From Swiss-Prot:
Major localization listed first in the record, in broad terms: endoplasmic reticulum
Family designation: Belongs to the cytochrome P450 family.
Protein name: Alkane hydroxylase MAH1
MF (Gene Ontology): heme binding; iron ion binding; midchain alkane hydroxylase activity
Keywords in alphabetical order: Endoplasmic reticulum, Heme, Iron, Membrane, Metal-binding, Monooxygenase, Oxidoreductase, Transmembrane, Transmembrane helix
Bilayer topology annotation: Single-pass membrane protein
Protein origin, superkingdom: Eukaryota
Amino acid sequence: MAMLGFYVTFIFFLVCLFTYFFLQKKPQGQPILKNWPFLRMLPGMLHQIPRIYDWTVEVLEATNLTFYFKGPWLSGTDMLFTADPRNIHHILSSNFGNYPKGPEFKKIFDVLGEGILTVDFELWEEMRKSNHALFHNQDFIELSVSSNKSKLKEGLVPFLDNAAQKNIIIELQDVFQRFMFDTSSILMTGYDPMSLSIEMLEVEFGEAADIGEEAIYYRHFKPVILWRLQNWIGIGLERKMRTALATVNRMFAKIISSRRKEEISRAKTEPYSKDALTYYMNVDTSKYKLLKPNKDKFIRDVIFSLVLAGRDTTSSVLTWFFWLLSKHPQVMAKLRHEINTKFDNEDLEKLVYLHAALSESMRLYPPLPFNHKSPAKPDVLPSGHKVDANSKIVICIYALGRMRSVWGEDALDFKPERWISDNGGLRHEPSYKFMAFNSGPRTCLGKNLALLQMKMVALEIIRNYDFKVIEGHKVEPIPSILLRMKHGLKVTVTKKI
């Protein structure tokens, strides 16, 4: 069986690689894929993978915002790509009940288990309600704010001061990932891994998460039998995925075991810890009957999903945000003027231009570039496209933010002013048009905490430091389910006087 799997994998990629190199001669500027016999559109898609995000912009502009991708015969990889706000509103809101994540999503994202990002129906409803109660708990909110403040003071500021003093090159994406990993770990587990330090020690979880996200991305374009064979045999990205998953499981097993021991020894009169791990270990099962606080696997799935979301999305936003500021000094100047004239330590809401600039950054560079859905029953989308039950629909969030038919002829321009109304307040855009925090009933519950955290970090850096991207540094996204920079963001930092 192992040998058969090897030959299936080898032959499949031999054909695809041959076609790929043949297509190297194909001129750019032709976004629509050719439909080949048997392999259909896959060879052309493989050719586009290094620039998949920009390709989706081109193909959706050329096809009136919706495009049907045909994968190899009998492979189960056909997908409908859309950036049509009408379709998005229909799928995520008005006909939400017919569009669960679906069984294919659970297969592809199997490493997340039964976390809130993968479950559907009654279990999702209970997890959503329990998460809502957690994210609106005042103690939890206070823990979020205090952990951000302490990590800024004891982690980010000393690191940036040291880099400025020694005039060394730092990798800002890595810095933000470490900061967010530390703060999300404190908030979700009560444990501070202290990954952000002057020494910048190796972080096993970070590397494991990055590998997992890349492997999950490529699963979307492979038949399930193929990537499962690769995983079983242990080759390619799937081999790395197995190792990464073992690292994650080992880390969370240790944290959960330690906390259970603490809970046993904790006197009944002592207060609970404020973090998510303790909350879910003591969740009220008379209220949330489908939750399993006594099962370590359930706790692992829930907390892993929350830590991953907290680390990856916010760090992605900040990385692209500061890169955009480096390209648009006039925006940086306006931000500093606003901070100097309107800011007080008690009210970040007064910084309207900062909020607008972050929103504009997320429009162009959303942390999650795609959303995957599957209809439970056949349906007809507002665009007129018919979709079968259990078919794959990919909402192209990255492309949505760049559609001229949605955002105007200046859609590719970085203009925070588009988010400011005539009276100087923030302009609201519907979530099916601006999907940085998802849309409909699955809208991100941590939106307000994430925005607060981003503003706190941005404020600290903008007010106290100048930074410069090193000359010749290439900025491009890596193909992944998360919008990360392939080469990071290498900068030098100086402290403002």
